[in-house]
Amino acid sequence: MQKNITKVSDTEQELEIILTAEEYGTEYNQELDEAKRTIQVKGFRKGHVPTGLIKKLAGPAIEASVAEKMASKHFGTIVDEEKIKPASRAQIESVSYEGDELKIKLSYEIHPVFELNNYSDYTFTKARYTITDEDVQKEIDLILKGHGSLATVDEAALGTDTVIGDVEKLDAAGEPEEGGKTENHHFNLEYLPEDNPFRISLEGAKAGETVNVATTQKDPNTPVVSYRITVKEVKRLELPELTDDLVKEITRQRFETVADFTADVRIQLEEHFGMKSDEELLESISSKLIEENPVSTPKSMVASFANMLVENAKRQFGGKFPKGFDESQFTESIIPNAEKHARWLLISQKIAELNNVEVTDEDIKTYAEKEAEKSTPEQKEEIMSTYQSTEFRDYIADTIIKDKIYDIIKSQVTITEEPTPVPVHKA
């Protein structure tokens, strides 16, 4: 067997495999014998069709099948011998039988060979979110909202109130349009953007007052649409007093006192924003390394990530995009993001390779134990068993490798912490 490898680009190669009749003959004869047994030709008994006629009728199909099997057989061996890292399946580009030789040309994508730029002098800032008593109270108030009640107030509407009013659409002369009235429309101001014209006009309004609202359009050529709202009622959410009994109800007996519940809310906030801080740091790290290492990305790898992003977007719409949604245009728009994902995969694999990162059975066990600690005693044994099962091993191993890679990077760069207030919750 002869082999000729040609570099097409940083991520593409062609491989020519040349086999002698002795090397592919056994497979060819097996295919020919199978054709003799199965092909029926009028005038000949089954299995007794002359070889020459069989070759004439089924020759091209036999040759194609033999070439495919030979390519599959030898490609893996050559990949191992030449230490090739394929990024896609090999495709047969051409097949030729010349004399006693079979020539097969394959094309495929590979992981690019590149040197990783030194990142030891990089500096990153990590947010250290500070949880205050006010943050804890705000979170508790959000929980209590589900147990509150709306009460009518004879006051100017606040940005958190609900305004009920009759809405009339106005014509160009400022008069109500026929059929353009909606009665008892509820405006929940808290859930309207701060720059929403309805929120701006209704904040501060009281029952019995009338306000005018002019909505601007994105298209400057589209005329302004005006409305008149007669405020009939302002409702304000009244939160219940947090008592031990309410705590028991809210938490289904998990906590019995306000103090214990409040302490848990703080712990949950600290854990949440601790994870948020880690995620933001890792995003900064990956973005910097991607920027500093413009590695060529195999098209198949980019396509795989693009497909993943499309499927993730579909799930947000309940499994499929709404009618009229241009999926092809959306897919095209996320290609740059898919390229970043592919580039980061290549960079992280390079870091793992340079640092001999591997996952041991002990790593799997430790990870499973850590996850099991988050569950109830009854679930721990099941979680330990599941996480160490063959079905979950690849997934867990991938997670552990990612964590190890980030730990390696963090140990080699400079990270400074910066006290950061908790972001304002936007409803």
Curated annotation (Swiss-Prot):
GO cellular component: cytoplasm
Keywords from the named record: Cell cycle, Cell division, Chaperone, Cytoplasm, Isomerase, Rotamase
Enzyme category, top tier: isomerase
Residue ranges annotated for the PPIase FKBP-type domain, each copy included: 160-240
Pfam families the UniProt entry points to: Trigger_C (PF05698), Trigger_N (PF05697)
Gene Ontology MF: a single term: peptidyl-prolyl cis-trans isomerase activity
Subcellular location: Cytoplasm
SUPFAM superfamilies the record matches: FKBP-like (SSF54534), Triger factor/SurA peptide-binding domain-like (SSF109998), Trigger factor ribosome-binding domain (SSF102735)
EC numbers, comma separated: 5.2.1.8
The UniProt record lists the keyword Cell division: yes
Function comment: Involved in protein export. Acts as a chaperone by maintaining the newly synthesized protein in an open conformation. Functions as a peptidyl-prolyl cis-trans isomerase.
Family: Belongs to the FKBP-type PPIase family. Tig subfamily.
Name of the featured protein: Trigger factor
Species this chain originates from: Chlorobium phaeobacteroides (strain DSM 266 / SMG 266 / 2430)
Gene label: tig
